[in-house]
Amino acid sequence: MRKRLLCISILFSTFDSLYAGNSWIRINQLGYLPDAVKVAVLISEEDIRIGHFQLRNAITETVVYKGQTKEYDASGWGMKSAYRLDFSNFKNAGGYYIQIDDIKSPCFRIANDVYNGTADFILNYMRQQRCGYNPYLKDSCHLNDGIIVDHPTKTGREIDVTGGWHDASDYLQYLTTSANATYQMLFAYLHNPGAYGDNYNAKGHKGKNGIPDILDEAKWGLEWLDKMNPAYGEMYNQIADDRDHIGYRLPSKDTAGYGLGKHRPVYYITGKQQGLAKHKNRTTGVSSSAAKFASAFALGAQLIKEYYPVFANKIAKKAAEAYEFALSDLGVCQTACNVSPYFYEEENYVDDLELAACELHRLTNKKYYFDQAVKWGAVEPVTPWMSSGRARHYQFYPFVNLGHYYLSEKQSIYIDYLKDGLQFIYERCEKDPFLNGIPFIWCSNNLVVAALTQARCYYNATKDSTYIKMEAALRDWLFGCNPWGTSMICGLPAGGDYPQLPHSSITYLLNETTYGGLIDGPVDKTIYNNLRGIHLLKKDEYAPFQNGKAVYHDDMGDYSSNEPTMDGTASLSFYLSSMEKEGNRNK
């Protein structure tokens, strides 16, 4: 009998070891706030039955908590088993790991300070993306921007629009994403000023200048927007085009040619279809771009006035003028392409008008702007990708409507609008082990951040915890609680599993990651297989996890899932600063 029991024990031990090799426990590598929802996810290539899990002290290895598992459908991620492991009731600070038989998670922390410094950390990427003078490279680039194109009378003239940020790992610059990035950083500072330090000066070099670093970065964006809108009704939407896509090189060594000598083309906002070659966009008006100018100028004027009063007054005036111009030719203004059919396919503009009117109301307290905001806000109650679960590339942009949050303080119907958007996402995620109802389009991580932002705004406005578990799951997704077990932010957390080989010249030529950058994120297999020019450069370390609905590669050759973006990174500012604020509140 004893021998038989020993054999059974060895048999189960063998099974445990076998499962440990193809079963994984995914966690938020950054850690968990003590009072927050805390969940890990187990996925397995085997059909296994698990009822309980243990939380162990990382130093003593003693069991500090036992919890029950909850089974979910694993098939969507190409697995046979999936369980959610909820340990929210355990609130003691410290270092821990989760264990189920021989399956162990990485170690993680529970503490109120796990998000401290993260909102400042992502500004490293914004500084790295600066055009003109680049503090990361300590060098300058694109000092001859640019030559006007598509203007009825000024085509061929020089215009000084040096500055701003490169959009991603290419060196194009778009008003669309730059204005949104500027606004997002200002919005974060408006709501969570205590999360931001002063460790860099206005040029982006280390050293205090008496101004929070996030305002330094937003000011950098505002100065460029000011150049791109030199006079009433004269706005520019883009510098360069996809002729830029000629391979890896540092921005200071940019050799892309546009037939303009040392200059790059600067696209005038015409309100009509644009494209200097075969491929054209589908522009129908000026509203989406002009209103983005207005919202960034209006909020910027309020927040930088203490430090730059003259400039603040200048852009306050431009904000009102930009809104007036936005109403003059209703429609969307898309980015322009040249050698390929890829561009930002923005198709909504009423959200931009709503937000611009909100910020002008905040700036001026004029009833006209409030009435305008309500008018436009009622046209699009829910950002369309949230309700439909699909979108083309940047079809509904910005990905979150922050005008609704402003109006929710005045009219309860806008709280309903915020809730409706979250409910659509929630209904798509209920059966997913990672509670992720985001469509895996190109730049899916930007949608994750948008959903997180809306969830946090809704909770701030209502204290309704209906979506708090989904919010936690999406937050954890960005830090490693996903099928691949990787953080989606380069360099965060330190010592964790994060993108080491993003699609970037910084990585290719300098052998460094793009610290602070949020990568595009997992993309639907069908989209991935139909994109041009993707060639993996190494063996896929995540091969076991590519059999589900979406794929991700930490590979320089995959621009679809592993390229950091400037606007996505900036959009993280509000959420990360909110989490730091939450942790510090509970200390």
Language-model features: where?
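Aromatic (Trp/Tyr) and acidic
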Residues: 25, 29-106, 112-113, 127-183, ...
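Active-site-surrounding "flap" and adjacent substrate/cofactor-binding loops of secreted or lumenal enzymes
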Residues: 104-105, 112-125, 193, 208
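Acidic, glycine-anchored loop motifs typical of Ca2+
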Residues: 203-214
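Carboxylate/His-rich catalytic cores and anion/metal-binding grooves
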Residues: 214-239
